[in-house]
């Protein structure tokens, strides 16, 4: 499993430590080895939460593991609804060549990603119930969308911003 790690062990702002073995993140879970499946079973993962688009899931279907519930709600819903792009090529090129265009496009998409997002809303609903844990959240590379989901989990648990930064997870103002 690529980019697999436990979110536990991080210090909260009030000095406690996030319990290990409850929240995991990774890249896509297609073509898992028997050993990977064994590890997920031994970790007692109850839910696998997938942020990938329909197209990504079609190209690289997740390995189905019995007794682990799978939920897939695309996190990039605007991208999915627009057919997988940030508007027309012409519009995108125009925006890229504006002053700080590429930075602004990327920053705005990540900044707005968790706002009113059904995917992250469902993630929060799941983690509120301890009986749903442990949970593994993932996207294709296990970085951006998964990073946002992991940051949300850690923020809810009270992990300091500096700790989130050390994990390589996006910070929002």
Write out the residue ranges for each language-model feature:
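Ser/Thr-glycine-rich phosphate-binding loops at phosphate-binding pockets of nucleotides
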Residues: 140-141, 145-146
């Amino acid at each position: 499993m690529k980019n697999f790690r436990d979110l536990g062990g991080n210090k909260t702002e009030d000095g406690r430590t996030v319990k290990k073995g409850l929240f995991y993140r990774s890249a896509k879970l297609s073509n898992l080895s028997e050993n990977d499946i064994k590890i997920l079973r031994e970790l007692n993962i109850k839910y696998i939460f997938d942020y990938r688009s329909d197209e990504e899931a079609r190209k690289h279907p997740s390995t189905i593991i019995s007794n682990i519930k799978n939920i897939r709600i695309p996190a990039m819903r605007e991208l999915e609804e627009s057919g997988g792009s940030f508007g027309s090529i012409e519009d995108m090129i125009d925006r890229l060549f504006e002053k700080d265009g590429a930075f602004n496009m990327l920053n705005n998409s990540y900044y707005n990603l968790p706002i009113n997002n059904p995917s992250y809303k469902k993630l929060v609903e799941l983690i509120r119930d301890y009986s749903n844990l442990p949970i593994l959240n993932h996207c294709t590379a296990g970085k951006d969308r998964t990073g946002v989901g992991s940051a949300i989990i850690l923020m809810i648990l009270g992990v300091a911003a500096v700790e989130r930064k050390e994990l390589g997870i996006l910070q929002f103002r």
